[in-house]
Curated annotation (Swiss-Prot):
Alphabetized InterPro entries for the sequence: P-loop_NTPase, RapZ-like, RapZ-like_N, RapZ_C
Keyword terms, alphabetized: ATP-binding, GTP-binding, Nucleotide-binding
Protein name: Nucleotide-binding protein Sbal_3671
Binding site for GTP: 56-59
Source superkingdom: Bacteria
Family, similarity comment: Belongs to the RapZ-like family.
GO molecular function: ATP binding; GTP binding
Task performed by this protein: Displays ATPase and GTPase activities.
Record-listed ATP binding positions: 8-15
Length: 284
């Protein structure tokens, strides 16, 4: 079982790191006391091989040797990776001032600045035991996400789920689309009597549309557009991308184009799906 422990000073980006881990398929638990890790791993054994927890200053033992003992008592088959996130006092003070959140160590007699300094002192033992120390003072959430992915995967690339959805404008436009393309200007198989009862999934319709230079040029240009901007969408922490292709009835042109685009992006780097709204509705 792989276990990732994320610790660090409040405001340094632990929640961002945990969200990245969740996107990578980890079962995530926020602010779990260290003595409970063993019980958690035992409960998840066999059902979850990827587990991540965040630990804040309120759940840390006061003595270094207790911390070392707790980490050493993990099950022998545990593959542990640990992160400590930190930022300068000045940056943490600025972040708390902007968000107006209450610091975990804030008390009526303790100022925010004093709480930040105290937390740094209490977490110092943990900062010396971790595998990866990341200073987030000059990082935005995207830079931090990239660093965490780089360490865990050896790459900053994020697995993006791409949905190509065909639809018919006469049945209404989909509301969840990130990109929407109108293909009603393309040659229409509907006017070929032999093709009218078929769909864009059928070979005769596919052959008809594949012979149309305008259709091939359109598919090529959409492919290039998406290839150009996909890396930027991935860096924006996007998990899903829905590309809607619409024709009049959602039976021929949009179905064919969606299928062709799905095939071109099914290269193993992304999870790609083709969905045909009107065809699915007709079956229901």
């Amino acid at each position: 079982m792989k276990l990732v422990i994320v610790s660090g000073r409040s405001g340094s980006g632990k929640s961002v790191a945990l969200r990245v881990l969740e996107d990578l398929g980890y079962y995530c638990v926020d602010n779990l006391p260290l003595p409970l890790i063993g019980s958690l791993l035992e409960q998840l054994k066999g059902s979850n091989d990827l587990v991540a927890i965040s630990v804040d200053v309120r759940n840390m033992p006061e003595q270094d040797k207790v911390l070392v003992k707790q980490l050493a008592s993990l099950p022998p088959d545990t593959e542990l990776t640990s992160f400590f996130l930190n930022s300068s006092d000045k940056i943490l003070l600025k972040r708390y001032s902007e968000t107006r959140r209450l610091h975990p160590l804030s008390k009526s007699q303790v100022s925010l600045q004093e709480a930040i300094k105290l937390e740094g002192k209490l977490l110092e033992p943990m900062s010396k035991l971790v595998d990866h120390y990341i200073d987030t003072s000059n990082l935005n959430i995207y830079d931090l996400s990239d660093q965490v992915r780089q360490i865990l995967l050896g790459s900053v690339d994020k697995e993006l789920v791409i949905n190509f959805e065909s639809f018919g404008f006469k049945h209404g436009m989909p509301t969840e689309a990130d990109f929407m393309f109108d293909v009603r200007f393309l040659p229409n198989p509907h006017w070929e009597l032999a093709l009218r009862p078929l769909t864009g999934l059928d070979e005769p319709v596919a052959e008809f549309l594949n012979r149309q230079p305008l259709v091939n040029k359109f598919i090529w240009q959409i492919e290039n557009l998406l290839e150009t901007w996909l890396p930027h969408l991935e860096r924006n922490n996007r998990s899903y991308l829905t590309v809607a292709i619409g024709c009049t009835g959602g039976q021929h042109r949009s179905v064919y184009v969606a299928e062709q685009l799905a095939k071109r992006f099914s290269n193993g780097k992304h999870k790609v799906y083709a969905r045909h709204r009107e065809l699915n509705n007709a079956k229901a």
